[in-house]
Amino acid sequence: MYTCGIDVGSVSTEAVILFRDNENPDVKGRIVSYVIIPTGASSKDAALKSFEEACLKASVSKEDVSSIVATGYGRINIPFANKNITEISCHARGVLHYFTAVKTVIDIGGQERKARADHMALWPMLWTLGFI
């Protein structure tokens, strides 16, 4: 199963395609491609371009991607996303999934900088949002 995450920021837009084997659900999603492009004047256009380029790079058709999650400054401008989630929620979920020993996350974006220390403090928020 392929999924895509798209982060639309004020400066750059990133897309990543992940593959997860449904036959082996204990294996974490594997990155099969990613792209980073300038956002430019249209976050919607940048999101679509990054998605198409990531699919091309992974040799995956857009139809093979079962879910698209958008985050970042321009996340609400991505009509083809199945879900949009705030950056802090994405950071927390990603860190807890892939890097359980990490205690600090720093996000340096084009408009703002965010830091979150001690990821255990994120558990109540994740519980409330239904992520755990």
Spans of features found by a protein language model:
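Short glycine-aspartate micro-motif
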Residues: 3-7, 65-69, 103-106, 126
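Structured core elements
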Residues: 5-7, 14-17, 69, 77, ...
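Conserved glycine-centered beta->alpha loop in an early N-terminal alpha/beta scaffold
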Residues: 48
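Short beta-strand-loop/turn "lid" adjacent to the catalytic site in phosphate-handling enzymes
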Residues: 33-40, 57-89, 123
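Short glycine-rich, Thr/Ser-proximal phosphate-binding strand/loop in the N-terminal lobe
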Residues: 5-45, 53, 121-129
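Conserved phosphate-binding catalytic cores of ATP/NTP-utilizing and phosphoryl-transfer enzymes
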Residues: 73-119
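Generic secondary-structure signature for well-ordered alpha-helical cores
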Residues: 18, 23, 52-60, 70, ...
